[in-house]
Every structure is written in C-alpha cells, then in structure tokens.
UniProtKB/Swiss-Prot annotation:
Belongs to the orthopoxvirus OPG058 family. Induction: Expressed in the early phase of the viral replicative cycle. The keyword Cell membrane does not apply. This is Protein OPG058. The lineage of its organism: Viruses, Varidnaviria, Bamfordvirae, Nucleocytoviricota, Pokkesviricetes. Coiled coil: none annotated. One of its GO terms (biological process) is symbiont-mediated suppression of host NF-kappaB cascade.
C-alpha cells in the first residue's frame, strides 16, 4: 500500500508525485517490520507525540505527521 504524504507545516515537497513517478532500478515498495514500527512509536511517545493507529498501521504516517505538527517539532 502506498501512502502519499503532504504537510505544509513540515514543508514536505509539493513535487512528491514526480519523485514517486521517477523510474528507478530499485524496487520502490518499502516493507517495514512491525517491531521497527513499534520502536518508532516508542521514540515518538518519548518525544511527546501522541500517535494513534489501527492494527494494520494503515494511517500511521498521517498520524505521525499530524502529531509532529501539533508538537511544533
């Protein structure tokens, strides 16, 4: 599943679609182990970010960005 991330508060590139669309010799799909996600969530919690997600982690990227914007990190 691909997520498109946009955040004016974090100045993420508006040209993300062209970056995603670029041809590459590497596989663009990224698989992240559930343990790595939990470690990231623990770090964000220690930094004071409140990140909620469902059991499939489908909305985790949006929740992280929203939490970081709220924290002014």
């Amino acid at each position: 599943m691909k997520h498109r991330l946009y955040s004016e508060g974090l100045s993420i590139s508006n040209d993300l679609n062209s970056i995603i669309g670029q041809q590459s010799t590497m596989d663009t799909d990224i698989e992240i182990d559930e343990d790595d996600i939990m470690e990231l969530l623990n770090i964000l919690t220690e930094l004071g970010c409140d990140v909620d997600f469902d059991e499939n982690f489908s909305d985790i990227a949006d929740d992280i960005l929203e939490s970081l914007i709220e924290q002014d990190v």
